[in-house]
Curated annotation (Swiss-Prot):
The gene is rpsC. This is Small ribosomal subunit protein uS3. Part of the 30S ribosomal subunit. Forms a tight complex with proteins S10 and S14. PANTHER family: 30S/40S RIBOSOMAL PROTEIN S3 (PTHR11760), SMALL RIBOSOMAL SUBUNIT PROTEIN US3C (PTHR11760:SF19). One of its GO terms (biological process) is translation. Belongs to the universal ribosomal protein uS3 family. Keywords: Ribonucleoprotein, Ribosomal protein, RNA-binding, rRNA-binding. It comes from Borreliella afzelii (strain PKo). The lineage of its organism: Bacteria, Pseudomonadati, Spirochaetota, Spirochaetia, Spirochaetales. GO terms for molecular function: mRNA binding; rRNA binding; structural constituent of ribosome. GO terms for cellular component: cytosolic small ribosomal subunit. Residues 39-110 form the KH type-2 domain. Binds the lower part of the 30S subunit head. Binds mRNA in the 70S ribosome, positioning it for translation.
Length: 291
């Protein structure tokens, strides 16, 4: 059911970040959240003429009495206005609404063809201007794919072309892996207000995988400690271990092998050396007694 879930909700802190960045006591949570909603609503109302060029509005709160608003747009000049007049008016409007100090910043979108929200806004604007929705969708699809998108899916729903029965129409090109969490999926939604009613536009844009596919050569295998020789042990220490194992049983030997971090091959070699060493010592003792 990945297609039913907002792509951002699954990918926060994987390859997406929160659009509102703040932390407050749970008693104030609903109040602050409502303030965020009002801020976004008032900005969109004020910039109604250029609302189709706004990609996102980020809100940052470092202290309770100051709010930093970041407006993300491909046309900073239109938002700023003549000598910053628009920003000043927005600041005054928001201060009056929420009675807090407002700081407004502008962030430019350098590649609007690869921004899902701007694509959705552009489609909605053209549909409102009575351009054929099929033509609009195909044009948006080809433009984004040429600019480097790895996959794009656009869905439009409502009374398309003035039809009496509402329906949906969808176009897709490339890969859009909604179930892959490492996939960087950008999502945008917009509404076209026509004489027939509201037509919804949804856009899913696949920009590539943010976290590379990681494969381990030892996947599914038991990982042993480093071999005895790789741990910098000397031959003297090896001989010392050999001498200590002359008079112990099999169970104790296995326990010591595990403690010393020996691999199966090393333990087998050590057992053989231990048995041959013991045999040589017995033979030499017998010769001494006989002599």
């Amino acid at each position: 059911m990945g297609q039913k879930v907002h792509p951002y909700s699954l990918r926060v802190k994987i390859n997406k970040d929160w659009k509102s960045k703040w932390y407050f006591d749970k008693k104030l949570y609903s109040t602050i959240l409502h303030e965020d909603f009002l801020i976004r609503l008032e900005i969109m109302k004020f910039l109604k003429g250029i609302k189709f060029d706004i990609s996102d509005i980020e809100i940052i709160r470092n202290n309770p009495q100051k709010v930093t608003v970041v407006i993300v747009t491909p046309r900073p000049g239109s938002v700023i206005g003549l000598k910053g007049s628009n920003l000043e008016k927005i600041g005054q409007l928001l201060t009056k609404k929420i009675s807090k100090k407002i700081s407004i910043k502008i962030k430019e979108v350098k590649r609007p063809e690869l921004d899902a929200q701007i694509i959705a806004n552009g489609i909605a604007k053209q549909v409102e201007n009575r351009v054929s929705y099929r033509k609009v969708l195909k044009s948006a699809l080809s433009t984004s794919m040429l600019k480097g998108a790895q996959g794009l899916k656009i869905k439009i729903a409502g009374r398309l072309g003035g039809a009496e029965i509402a329906r949906s129409f969808e176009v897709k090109e490339g890969r859009v892996p909604l179930h892959t969490l490492r996939a960087n999926i950008d999502y945008g939604f917009s509404e076209a207000h026509t004489t027939y009613g509201i037509i919804g536009v949804k856009v899913w844009l696949f920009k590539g995988e943010v976290l590379g596919r990681q494969t381990n050569s030892d996947a599914g295998q038991v990982i042993n400690k480093k071999p005895f020789r790789e741990r910098g042990e000397t031959v003297k220490n090896f001989d010392k271990i050999l001498n200590n194992r002359e008079k112990i049983n099999e169970k104790q030997t296995r326990a010591l092998n595990k403690k010393d971090g020996l691999s199966k091959d090393e333990a087998s070699l050590l057992n053989k050396l231990s048995s041959s060493f013991s045999k040589e010592r017995v033979d030499s003792n017998e010769q001494n007694i006989g002599g």
